[in-house]
Amino acid sequence: MIALIGMAPTEAEADVEEGEEKKKRERKAAGAAFTWIQTHFATCPPDATDDVIQTHARVYMWYVVSRTLFPDSTGKNAPWMWLKVLTVFDSKWSWGSATLTYLYRQLDDACCRITDSAGIGGNMLLLSVWSWERLPVGRPKSVRFNPWYEDEHDELRCPTWAYKWDVVSEMTNDVNLMYQKYVAELDTITPEQVEWQPYGADDRLGYTPEFRINPMCFRDRDLWLMRCPLICNWAIEFHLPHRVFRQFGLFQPHPPEWVDTDKALHR
């Protein structure tokens, strides 16, 4: 990766885990520690050439993508594969589909981890906001967000729905006890307790009395009900909206049509 960013961490710098902790961890993709990126690319030189500026921009995007869209279960490492993807700035790849695919696969993998140090990867902000908006389980007790700056003539400057959860109360209870509590509550939840369409319905989609969402979030709404494989590098997961028709304001047949999602089909 020296050809892309001009340097690479040494083996010692890239290995952010040591001893027994390292042995217990599941295998992770080769990359650079976030601390290494911060040390070497935190500030772009004031007299930087165009090539240096582009390198810093690419590394910054790599850092953000690895920490938000595709974080691994360690939370400490930026895999090289995401940096390679950023060699083409004007690509037309579907980052949203890839993010969802990666999250699905991380949820699959997390269910199979049994070590004390086992973690979960994927976009936890996306998963958290989705859950908080719909399920009365694990939802923060208090939520508020600061007023968005006024720019009435540019809807594309409006925030996304996650901004509603900008400031939340944190849970400080014992993790194991809260896990047991959440599992028990999820096992007993009823359809009537679920907020199926938190973003509004029909022509009011994205507009609530207290919040107005960025219209870019609805740009691809004609694809929301498409049944297809979602692809993210090695991971392939199926998009099966027919299982959750009520999220789209539609009647939910019961049981939904069965689709084989065996592991063999993921490869």
Describe the residue ranges of each PLM region.
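Structural stabilizers in ordered domains
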Residues: 1-267
